[in-house]
Amino acid sequence: MAFWCQRDSYAREFTTTVVSCCPAELQTEGSNGKKEVLSGFQVVLEDTVLFPEGGGQPDDRGTINDISVLRVTRRGEQADHFTQTPLDPGSQVLVRVDWERRFDHMQQHSGQHLITAVADHLFKLKTTSWELGRFRSAIELDTPSMTAEQVAAIEQSVNEKIRDRLPVNVRELSLDDPEVEQVSGRGLPDDHAGPIRVVNIEGVDSNMCCGTHVSNLSDLQVIKILGTEKGKKNRTNLIFLSGNRVLKWMERSHGTEKALTALLKCGAEDHVEAVKKLQNSTKILQKNNLNLLRDLAVHIAHSLRNSPDWGGVVILHRKEGDSEFMNIIANEIGSEETLLFLTVGDEKGGGLFLLAGPPASVETLGPRVAEVLEGKGAGKKGRFQGKATKMSRRMEAQALLQDYISTQSAKE
């Protein structure tokens, strides 16, 4: 059985009757990215204008009597609509589809059929699967690689067919119809019942499909192939946008271009060269900065070594610096008799720490210092270093070390 959304992909609302409404749960992804379970109801209607997930196409969103439908799934010949409000069986309801989402899916799905057919016709490249993503779609082709010329030829051909305004129609064939054997497709679901649905692009392609499609290729507006990516099992993913997604992509790209023009103070044609120059300048500055930091670390190490306060616990904190900076100081000092506690980072945030000195003392104190600074670390051979999330507790860590030294001195 075909749902109303399949018989008329352009229908935006539909009046029907509630068949059943049962308590159900839906696993979904929350705003924090974690899985959460929603309690609600599984509503079955006599027919529906909301497409249930299938054929590589995501399900529709919409409303039933202004009640939001959060998921639509197919179960045999019926569609289950998940809502968080119950509906009375036997009642008449108005079902409305989220048209922006639906039309986007129609453009991407029909675009996939067209690209698949053209890739096969031009280069005998077979489609093994496809994915309709939130921002872009991918067609997996049974080839280890594609040339830029092949990609360009496919893009040119599909857009020519869009300009030719070729009609797209849907037919239903019985399972025993001889024509079924001549139709492309990757098979039917195990629970499929009823006639076979065939989507035909006039003179281009005829394919088994359960999805919603445009009625004419002109509704695709344009297809842009963004390129290829390496796929699984020695295959290639062809990345594409169709219809309104191309316009949105162009709008984002133009916005980025304008922003870069203002930042780089040059025309779009010079952006790449300007960024390369900035990268080269940054590398030189980073190298010079590293050399200066190393010289500073050596100077600091010698100053600490010759300080009248040398002995017990030697403490140094700097806002600027990195792990290498601290290790240079520790290497230059090279003492296993004195505890050296070095920290770098913002006192109001996180940073890095290093504890060096007598191996037994460092082994004991390292994890405790990490705990005080609410960080993590590891070490061996008289050196323990790691990341701290609370550099504001640095004074507590210093007190811990000084207490330890005082206790050790008292024992001696």
Swiss-Prot record:
Molecular function GO terms recorded: alanine-tRNA ligase activity; ATP binding; metal ion binding; nucleic acid binding; Ser-tRNA(Ala) deacylase activity
GO BP: any one term: regulation of translational fidelity
Entry GO terms, CC: cytoplasm; nucleus
Positions of post-translational Phosphoserine modification: S174
Binding, Zn(2+): H109, H113, C209, H213
Cofactor binding: number and manner: Binds 1 zinc ion per subunit.
Cofactors required: Zn(2+)
Keywords, sorted A to Z: Cytoplasm, Metal-binding, Phosphoprotein, Protein biosynthesis, Zinc
Chain segments annotated as coiled-coil in the UniProt record: none
Keyword Phosphoprotein: yes
Alphabetical list of InterPro entries matching this protein: Ala-tRNA-synth_IIc_core, Alanyl-tRNA_Editing_Enzymes, Thr/Ala-tRNA-synth_IIc_edit, Transl_B-barrel_sf, tRNA_SAD
Predominant cellular place of this UniProt entry's protein: cytoplasm
Intracellular or extracellular location(s): Cytoplasm
Family per record: Belongs to the class-II aminoacyl-tRNA synthetase family. Alax-L subfamily.
Function (record text): Functions in trans to edit the amino acid moiety from incorrectly charged tRNA(Ala).
Protein name stated in the entry: Alanyl-tRNA editing protein Aarsd1
Organism from which the protein derives: Homo sapiens (Human)
Lineage: Eukaryota, Metazoa, Chordata, Craniata, Vertebrata
